[in-house]
């Protein structure tokens, strides 16, 4: 399900954003409205995701979100890149019942915090782990083929 990438763009940030958007595209969110992806405390990542959403013609909106305003948000998905795993978990717990699909690039163990934890392997490719407990609590359905691609450990 991954799109071929131009070799000049084949870097880890590009791959993380494309992987995030690809997983999101294989997810069935609870509502039928346009999906809002909120990026916590990282306007640069917001800008990059907006660029790739436009380039790949996805119908998502993206906004930067300060973690202080997390509870009052209307986000169907959230992207953490600088937030520690424990704080990710606390923020997600504060919005319990909203069904938020969460992604992180700052959660190597993936035991608490985000549902999908993206990382760069020692060979330079992008992979991810899945926290199945968080996924089941979110009540968001993700195509099982995506879950089969997750890595248990490097």
List where the protein language model places each region.
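Short hydrophobic alpha-helices and adjacent helix-cap/hinge residues
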Residues: 8-154
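Bacterial N-terminal signal peptides
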Residues: 1-5
């Amino acid at each position: 399900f991954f799109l071929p990438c131009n070799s000049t763009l084949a870097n880890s940030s590009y791959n993380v954003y494309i992987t995030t958007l690809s997983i999101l595209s294989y997810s069935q969110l609870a509502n039928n409205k346009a999906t809002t992806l909120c990026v916590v405390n990282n306007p640069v990542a917001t800008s990059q995701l907006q660029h790739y959403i436009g380039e790949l013609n996805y119908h998502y909106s993206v906004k930067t979100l300060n973690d202080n305003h997390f509870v009052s948000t209307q986000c169907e998905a959230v992207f953490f890149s600088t937030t520690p795993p424990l704080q990710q978990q606390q923020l997600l717990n504060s919005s319990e019942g909203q069904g938020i699909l969460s992604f992180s690039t700052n959660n190597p163990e993936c035991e608490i915090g985000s549902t999908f934890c993206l990382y760069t392997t020692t060979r330079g490719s992008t992979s991810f782990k899945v926290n199945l407990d968080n996924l089941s609590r979110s009540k968001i359905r993700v195509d099982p083929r995506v879950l089969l691609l997750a890595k248990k450990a490097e």
